[in-house]
From Swiss-Prot:
Family matches, as PROSITE patterns: ACONITASE_1, ACONITASE_2
Name recorded for this polypeptide: 3-isopropylmalate dehydratase large subunit 1
UniProt cross-references to Gene3D superfamilies, sorted A to Z: Aconitase, domain 3 (3.30.499.10)
Assigned protein family: Belongs to the aconitase/IPM isomerase family. LeuC type 1 subfamily.
Cofactor stoichiometry and binding remark: Binds 1 [4Fe-4S] cluster per subunit.
Quaternary state and interactors: Heterodimer of LeuC and LeuD.
Pathway assignment: Amino-acid biosynthesis; L-leucine biosynthesis; L-leucine from 3-methyl-2-oxobutanoate: step 2/4
Length: 477
């Protein structure tokens, strides 16, 4: 391989990651580490407020406020009227308002058009664009890769560094390509595909990698499904997930408030069409999934890798040879209150949560509403629907989705993160069981001793009206 500037240059076909990464390199720090320019810095109330306060304490200005955007989502109440935001949430929101105003940062505030979960509003406003490098102090920033962006979460010190310099130092990750090929079976969604992948490779299967998703199932998938796929990349340990932009991407982005307009749009699309892995590009790891073999998925344990088809049975630790894995399964079963070998379908549930940066977009609510239409939430079940943004809420109301949910006995709430991370006291009570469209089922994630099963919006709605984990394929019209 040739050497340029003291660095070995790979002249083989380039991956999508390499093309976007190389466009953002300001300086090489070492053989595998670079100083990168950041195109978009997204802030939320939890990390953004603290980062801005930290910057002010150092007497430093925000370097590029016009490339920084903020919204409250984590610590705000999603109750009607925003009633009951806890003291910490009120303080974080007040700080976010004060510091963004002082710094000239655009804030999409509560009840304003554009407010919502940061990983929902980025794409819908056109802040997230193909080829962009996007960071946020949140692990699910990988969501934006569904539009062909290089997007990843950063820590608190990195957040302050980006505010001060509009740059970040990063080690280039290894590359993995996951090819989803085949026709999507009835009742199977993007959420099922990514959960099945996590179950296949494990929660650490993507550690150290940037994962590019490809294949016929991805090419035929709408953008909101692609965002769901990329959202859970971090749950298989990956730094980022990304999908090559195509005509579906361009049609989605066109006309959004922050998207290029006029001649700039044509120039942008011309550039974006080059953002795909070359046919001879080499990946460090390849995984192929036949989507025709996938059925609706549901998690049973305390990690996203603890997943099985809805017609499956809870694993029996006695069948596991590896002592460490057997012990982990025993702990998970004890926490979840499940019997080894029992069918997962029919497991009684107490709560259903439809929301989060994974599954709170309009298409998600439509899928859940289709199941809820004409049915009632089962006795003893509390079911919440939390739209991902003010825009999603507005559009859902315009379609009458809110009425479908309310008539069925669901609680229709305001945009925010809510029960995904037990924010603002919005928790599943101890010992109770939830089916959730969110991304993590860790111990205590939805509240102390809360038991969480991850599923698609349609599967969650099926659980709400059945009072138990149910196969949505028997209910969809």
């Amino acid at each position: 391989m040739p050497i340029r500037g003291g660095r070995i240059v790979d002249t083989r076909g380039r991956t999508l990651l390499a093309k976007i990464w190389d466009q953002h390199v300001i300086a090489h720090v070492s053989d595998d580490t670079d100083l990168l320019h950041v195109d978009r810095h997204l802030l939320h109330d939890l990390g953004g407020s603290r980062g801005l306060i930290d910057l002010k304490s150092r007497n430093l200005p925000v370097h590029n406020p016009e490339l920084t955007f903020a919204t409250p989502d984590h610590a705000i109440s999603t109750a009607s009227g925003r009633a009951g935001t806890i003291t910490t949430g009120q303080e974080l929101l007040a700080a976010l308002r004060t510091e963004t105003s002082a710094s000239g940062i655009r804030l999409f505030d509560i009840d304003q058009p554009g407010q919502g979960i940061v990983h929902v509003i980025g794409p819908e406003l056109g802040l997230s664009l193909p080829g962009c490098l996007i960071v946020c102090g949140d692990s699910h920033t990988c969501t934006h890769g569904g539009l062909g962006a290089l997007a990843f979460g950063i820590g608190s010190s990195e957040l302050t560094h980006v505010l001060a310099t509009q740059t970040i130092i990063q080690r280039r990750p290894k590359t993995m390509r996951v090819t989803f090929d085949g026709r999507m079976p009835f009742g199977v969604t993007a959420k099922d595909l990514i959960l099945a992948l996590i179950g296949h490779v494990g929660a650490a299967g993507g550690t150290g990698y940037a994962v590019e998703y490809a294949g016929s199932a991805i090419r035929g998938m709408p953008i909101e499904g692609r965002l769901t796929i990329c959202n859970l990349s971090v749950e298989l340990g990956a730094k980022m997930g990304l999908i090559a932009p195509d005509q579906t991407t361009f049609d989605y982005v066109r006309g959004r408030p922050y998207a290029p307009q006029g001649e700039m749009w044509e120039r942008a699309v011309t550039a974006w069409r080059t953002l795909r892995s070359d046919s001879d590009a080499m990946f460090d790891r390849e995984v192929t999934i036949d989507v025709g073999t996938i059925i609706p998925q549901i998690t049973w344990g305390t990690s996203p890798e603890h997943v099985l088809g809805v017609d499956g049975r809870v694993p029996d630790p006695r069948d596991i040879a590896d002592p460490a894995r057997r012990g982990a399964i025993e702990i998970a079963l004890d926490y979840m209150g499940l019997k080894p070998g029992a069918p997962i379908a029919g497991t009684k549930v107490d709560w259903v949560f439809i929301g989060s940066c994974t599954n709170s977009r309009l298409s998600d609510l439509r899928a859940a509403a289709e199941v809820a239409r004409g049915r009632k939430v089962a006795p003893g079940v509390r079911a919440w629907v939390v739209p991902g943004s003010e825009t999603v809420k507005r559009d859902a109301v315009a379609e009458g989705l809110d009425k479908i949910f309310i008539d069925a006995g669901f609680e229709w709430r305001e945009p925010g993160c809510s029960m995904c991370l037990a924010a603002n006291g919005e928790t599943v009570p101890p010992g109770q069981r939830s089916v959730s469209t969110s991304n993590r089922n860790f111990i205590g994630r939805q509240g102390p001793r809360a038991r969480t099963h991850l599923a698609s919006p349609a599967m969650a709605a099926a659980a709400a009206v059945s009072g138990a984990i149910a196969d949505v394929r028997t209910m969809e019209r």
